[in-house]
Amino acid sequence: MAKKSSVEKNKHRAQLVKQYAGRRARLKAIANDETLSMEERFEARLKLAELPRNSAPVRLRNRCEISGRPRAFTRKMKMSRIAVRELGSQGLIPGLVKSSW
């Protein structure tokens, strides 16, 4: 089980990403638009830098929905390998069969 503070910190970051997504996209579009003047683009970059750092989607960490584990994360199931193995062994994941040879 991951530290609760780490999981909560990531949840807060996800909330900030969602909150600032529109504003960030607008400013990025202005900053990358080559038809505008350099001053306007630079101003957009400065405003982009003023946004909270944790509102950047890059700072989000994929975490297991069950344990909060940050590593060995399976995107398709949103779980870590350990959680997938445990639930798969119990037969709680449809279509997942434990292999044996």
UniProtKB/Swiss-Prot annotation:
Pfam families referenced in this protein's UniProt entry, alphabetically: Ribosomal_S14 (PF00253)
Q: Is the Ribonucleoprotein keyword given for this protein?
A: yes
GO cellular component labels: cytoplasm; small ribosomal subunit
Q: Which GO terms describe its biological process?
A: translation
Supply one GO molecular-function term: structural constituent of ribosome
Per UniProt, the keywords (alphabetical) are: Ribonucleoprotein, Ribosomal protein, RNA-binding, rRNA-binding
> Which domain of life does this protein belong to?
Bacteria
**HAMAP family per UniProt:** Ribosomal_uS14_1
Q: How does it assemble?
A: Part of the 30S ribosomal subunit. Contacts proteins S3 and S10.
NCBIfam families hit by this protein = PRK08881.1
Q: What does this protein do?
A: Binds 16S rRNA, required for the assembly of 30S particles and may also be responsible for determining the conformation of the 16S rRNA at the A site.
Q: Which family does it belong to?
A: Belongs to the universal ribosomal protein uS14 family.
Task: Tell me which PANTHER family the record gives.
Answer: 30S RIBOSOMAL PROTEIN S14 (PTHR19836), SMALL RIBOSOMAL SUBUNIT PROTEIN US14M (PTHR19836:SF19)
Q: What is this protein called?
A: Small ribosomal subunit protein uS14
Q: Give the species.
A: Beijerinckia indica subsp. indica (strain ATCC 9039 / DSM 1715 / NCIMB 8712)
